[in-house]
Amino acid sequence: MNARRCVAVLGFAFLACACPLPPPLPPKAGPPPPPGEIVLDHGFIVLQLHTPPGPAGPKPTVISFLADQELLLAAGVVVATYRLEWKLVEAFRPPEPPPAPGAHPVGQWLLAAPSPKTVGKGFFGVITTNAESAIPKIVDYLATRPEVDAARIGVAGNSTYGFTALQAAAADPRLTAAVSLVASGDYRCFLNLSNLAMAGKPLDLDPVYARWLDEHDPVRHPERLVHTALLMVNGKDDPAVPLACAERTARVLRGAYQRAGVPERFRFQLAGGGHVIEEAARRETLAWFQRWLIHPGS
């Protein structure tokens, strides 16, 4: 089983890449996908391409998790959106070990865990499956399409998918531009300070989980990102993704881009407000892709 397939098969499990389970059989043939949908990875990835009317020839393309695609389409960008069919791999998810005696649940939403030892494990499992398994397969496919310029593929996302965009850019050097909105690349800081995780209480992760987390954490491997023109935009008053974590991420990444001799390829922008910064994000996202993906070098 190759590494990408193993990650996809086990989804939420943070030990997925190391598990010895055999690969699943391809699902039985079902009805054809709806018009416009492209099925990849035995049906696990369902992709849609939104193509602008012009210009002719290969175009810049953005794998986008953003709700508003119209600005990119109007700028002549192919927009790729997708979903993952988790139900196809749920049966291969290994059971979670029982919590230790006396453990107390922590966290909220996808970051919830039966004890502080594994806070955020499911959240980062979802991110890693998207960033390091699904998106590289989508890039493989995009490179075969005549309307796509394979040298100008980017990724953009906000919140959970802002984390995904950041980690995907670190994992795949073919992504030449990225926009990460209201996210952080310092995973330990995020788990420590976010009101969705430990909310400032001490972080005490299981050692195996901690090692896995550090391997995928962008701030611990900032050199993996310097091939990508990266924009980060964060809210100043965001309890979900605290400013301190965004600023730590920016400080580490800015240093990496400077050491690589390309400081202009990284930008960190603060917006007023909290976790919802749509208007600022729209402006900054389009301007960044105009500079680095649509008209690079101009």
Language-model segments: what does each one mean?
Residues 8-17:
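Bacterial N-terminal signal peptides
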Residues 74-115:
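Conserved alpha/beta-hydrolase
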Residues 103-146:
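Alpha/beta-hydrolase active-site loop
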Residues 136-199:
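Primarily recognizes the serine-hydrolase "nucleophile elbow" in alpha/beta-hydrolase
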Residues 56-67:
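Short beta-strand element of the alpha/beta-hydrolase
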